Amino acid sequence: MTEPTQHRYIPNAEEDVKEMLATIGIDSIDRLFESIPNDVKLKKLLEIPGPWSEIESRRWFRELATKNRSAVDHLSFLGGGSYAHSQPACVDQLLLRAEFLTSYTPYQPEVSQGTLQSIFEYQTHQCLLTGLDVANASLYDGSTALCEAVLLAERVAKNRSKIVIAKSVHPQYTDTVRAYIQNLGYEVVEVGWGADGRIDLDALRAACTSDVFAVAIQSPNFLGVLEDYDAIRTIADGEGAVKIAVVAEATSFGIVSPPGEHGFDICVGEGQAWGVPTQFGGPYVGFMVVRDALKRHMPGRLVGETVDVDGRRAYVLTLATREQHIRRGKATSNICTNEALIALAANIYLSLMGKDGLREVAVQCLQKAAYLREKLAAISTVTTPLSGPVYNEFVVRTPYAARDILADLEHEKILGGIPLADFYPGHENEFLVAVTELHSREHLDRYASVLSACISRERR
């Protein structure tokens, strides 16, 4: 008996295809795809070359990789929510352990006490850093963490329809919130910033009406400026709105007073800065921490500590509010496989660094940013227009288009920053510069020197 003709890598033989077509009542592949317009159909065979050897394949990928611009072969001052920090070598090494190398928490979680313990430790770090009471096991990233916080706030402050978000919250986070709530009937009210780069308190006061269920601000904000938590809390409390703090640069917790100590209800953000490389924008890890009264409204997983029948310490999933565990109508989230492996990386990093190590990273970021900010402001026609206090990121303004200046810097192997106009039209001459502990004094001096030369060339 002859075997049906079949391509080596395609499981369906010609006889199989004919049988399937007959089952659905048509006689050809062309009939199957006749709904596709002819002008977009490929009418010739693809010219695919023959197979490559492993050596040839590796060579091709290496050549392709040389087109990337990275912080290895460029001096990078990119930030805007993704920061190149030092990652201790043992973080990656520990992640490679077979019992950890998965992003999935198991469906019989109590069997995996090691996994649950690592998540519990991660949650403990979050509580200590934010000054709040209860953290969950992680979320997808900073933007979706903010979305979940907004939905949580609406569940708590019922029968209200507006969320006030500072315009200086990462614009991509705000866009994600709009996508989440666009069909839920809620309105996003944005409040701008003043000359110091902080949220305009008068505008915030006017925006906080009785139908606002939450106020969300970011600190350090997208412009790099540290917000006044106390002033914002006072205004939000006047209308009983839930107060949400967003932190996209998580090393700032090493030196900045946490939002929980200033009366905020929820802190969410991006944990990438805790030992996770920038890696093309992901995967990252979102975090959420709330005051105790809100714990039953939290999305995702939560690990608790208890004792087993023999009196030994044990870890369990508790307050499970996912739709897999309770009625869909009562569920607070459908968060499923999240970023447990990346949360483990953050946990390892924070455990290794400790309080003193994290503070040292934060102090270096703060001091080096202040040094570069002063150096750049000393260049003729260059200003740092926002007067508010900053952590490790700040806005630079020149008389020339930011894209042109940054292109000139890139020719010198410097990734000089992010054009602000990509996020805020009308700011075409401004760009955002981020500094971390990886930058040396020589790096900062070189940046200032090359920028000065670029400005001089533009003048001519």
Regions found by a protein language model. Name each.
Residues M1-L21:
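Charged, compositionally biased N-terminal leader segments and the immediate start
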Residues D16-A22, T124, D422-R460:
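PLP-dependent enzyme catalytic core of the Aspartate aminotransferase-like
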Residues E34-E121:
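N-terminal entrance/gating region of PLP-dependent enzymes' catalytic architecture
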Residues R97-P109, H125-L132, K158, I181-V189, ...:
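Gly-rich Lys/Arg/Thr-decorated short loops/hinges at beta-loop-alpha junctions or inter-strand turns
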Residues Y107-V111, T115, Q123, C127-C147:
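Short loop-beta-helix segment that forms the pyridoxal 5′-phosphate
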Residues T144-R312, T381, V396, R403-A407, ...:
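Conserved PLP-enzyme active-site core in the AAT-like
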Residues W274-S380, T384-S387:
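Active-site C-terminal subdomain of aminotransferase-like
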Residues S387-P389, E412-F431:
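Conserved PLP cofactor-binding pocket of PLP-dependent enzymes
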